[in-house]
């Protein structure tokens, strides 16, 4: 996924974080 955190990249995408 395209996450800026890497660790919670997938989680961020689910929460609505396009980082």
Swiss-Prot record:
Heterotetramer of two alpha chains and two beta chains. One of its GO terms (molecular function) is metal ion binding. It comes from the Eukaryota. Red blood cells. Involved in oxygen transport from the lung to the various peripheral tissues. The keyword Cell wall biogenesis/degradation does not apply. This is Hemoglobin subunit beta-2. Coiled coil: none annotated. Keywords: Heme, Iron, Metal-binding, Oxygen transport, Transport. Belongs to the globin family.
């Amino acid at each position: 996924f395209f996450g800026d955190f890497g660790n919670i990249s997938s989680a961020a995408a689910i929460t609505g974080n396009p980082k």
